[in-house]
């Protein structure tokens, strides 16, 4: 599975598809490859696309559990008996879902306060762990995975010393690359 994920990182967008040839999709990919967190990028896009006033992102938790596959545990360097937590959120701008994310993380690498916030609130993971001064390492980038997902990113979040603490699979929605037309 790990080799399949890494091969997908090099897979080009399908030529001729709306998402694959979209300048907006190319810009979204470039922005998400930059130093900002996904939440910061989506906050900026929310405002630029005028999807809501104010252009703010909120995370809505989807309460469910999903065990980490073996390859996820490997990518996170999790010890054999180490417990991982799972969190699924929808990042929304007003009434619009911009992305849905599956996140497996190592609670032992976070502070007690961070774990409490993640367990009891809808705050985005990136906002909560920002004090760790983490960086993202993209493992794969897939375009046009299905009609509702013009872009899927798989990334690992790492501390400045290179220790992985989170693996996230982000599914970005069409509204980002084909926003609704507003009449003026």
Residue ranges of model-derived segments:
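N-terminal domain-onset segments
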Residues: 14-92, 96-145, 162-168, 172-184
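Well-ordered beta-strand positions
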Residues: 1, 90-92, 158
């Amino acid at each position: 599975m790990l080799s399949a994920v890494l091969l997908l990182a090099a897979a080009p967008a399908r030529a001729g598809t709306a998402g694959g040839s979209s300048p907006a999709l190319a810009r979204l990919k470039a922005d998400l490859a930059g130093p900002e967190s996904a939440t910061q990028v989506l906050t900026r896009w929310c405002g630029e696309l005028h999807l809501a006033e104010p252009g703010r992102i909120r995370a809505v938790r989807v309460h469910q559990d999903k065990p980490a596959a073996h390859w996820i545990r490997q990518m996170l360097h999790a010890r054999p008996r180490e417990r991982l937590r799972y969190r699924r959120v929808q990042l929304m701008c007003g009434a619009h879902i911009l992305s849905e994310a599956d996140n497996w993380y190592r609670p032992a690498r976070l502070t007690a306060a961070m774990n409490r916030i993640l367990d009891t609130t809808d705050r985005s993971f990136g906002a909560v762990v920002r004090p760790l001064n983490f960086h993202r390492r993209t493992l794969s980038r897939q375009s046009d995975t299905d009609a509702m997902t013009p872009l899927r990113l798989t990334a690992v979040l790492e501390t400045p010393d290179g220790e992985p603490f989170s693996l996230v699979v982000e599914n970005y929605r069409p509204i980002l690359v084909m926003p609704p037309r507003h009449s003026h």
